[in-house]
Amino acid sequence: MGRGKIEIKRIENKTSRQVTFCKRRNGLLKKAYELAILCDAEIALIVFSSRGRLYEFSNVNSTRSTIERYKKASASTSGSAPVIDVNSHQYFQQEAAKMRHQIQTLQNANRHLIGESIGNMTAKELKSLENRLEKGISRIRSKKHELLFSEIEYMQKREADLQNENMFLRAKVAEAERAEHDDQQAAEDDEMAPAPAVGGGSSSGTELEALPATFDTREYYQPAPPVSMLAAAAAAAAAQYSSDHHQTALHLGYFKVDSGKGGLL
């Protein structure tokens, strides 16, 4: 079974790149040696590794002599330089043509994606385009739904945070209102309470202080009765007391002692 085709591009792995360089360098030197022997050609080969190390091969005295011969040939031959320039110009023209073709292909593909320039497409190409569009739309919808779900989840979390913050603020406001109401009620109670008596005193003094400011003692003032009226009142009171005392003694059954005898009156 033959060896598979290797894609020519830079080897990313450093170790693999170094191993490949050593193998292919030896192969290149071998090919140069064989070419010099088989064709009797003067060959000078110069190679610099990625680390800057120099490798050279020459089938003559030295590589420097071959380089000097090259310089002399370039200076004496006027047609050699234009040949190199023509080759370079042709190379860049080919590369530019490739780039233009790639740009045209990409532009056509973009037009096909929006439904333009599809008149010359075959049924197979249209079916392939349809499949690609469906896959693209499916991926776009999936990504859109993912973003929407993420946004909804974020908004729900934000809503919960705002509700918690609102409840906290309501509790703070209610607490402040209760404290203000309690302070106001305490102030009203202090205003309604009577002032204490200064230096102590009887209850009558406190009651007099509690009387309204409009109290007028002149309304309760009455002149003293004359002396004769006082004497008559005192005599009546004494007579009444004597009568009451005599009746009480009769009802209680007092014993009266007479000539050394006792008996119930």
UniProtKB/Swiss-Prot annotation:
Record key words, sorted: DNA-binding, Nucleus, Transcription, Transcription regulation
Record GO biological process: positive regulation of transcription by RNA polymerase II; regulation of transcription by RNA polymerase II
A cellular component annotation (GO) from this entry: nucleus
The keyword DNA-binding belongs to this UniProt entry's keyword annotation: yes
UniProt cross-references to PANTHER family, sorted A to Z: SERUM RESPONSE FACTOR HOMOLOG
Domain called K-box: residue spans: 89-179
Tissue expression pattern: Expressed in developing seeds.
GO molecular function terms attached to this record: DNA-binding transcription factor activity, RNA polymerase II-specific; protein dimerization activity; RNA polymerase II cis-regulatory region sequence-specific DNA binding
Main location: nucleus
Compositional bias (Basic and acidic residues): 175-184
Function of the molecule: Probable transcription factor.
Protein's recorded name: MADS-box transcription factor 21
Gene coding for it: MADS21
Signal peptide: none
Subcellular location: Nucleus
Domain MADS-box intervals: 1-61
InterPro entries: MADS-box/MEF2_TF, MEF2-like_N, TF_Kbox, TF_MADSbox, TF_MADSbox_sf
SUPFAM superfamilies: SRF-like (SSF55455)
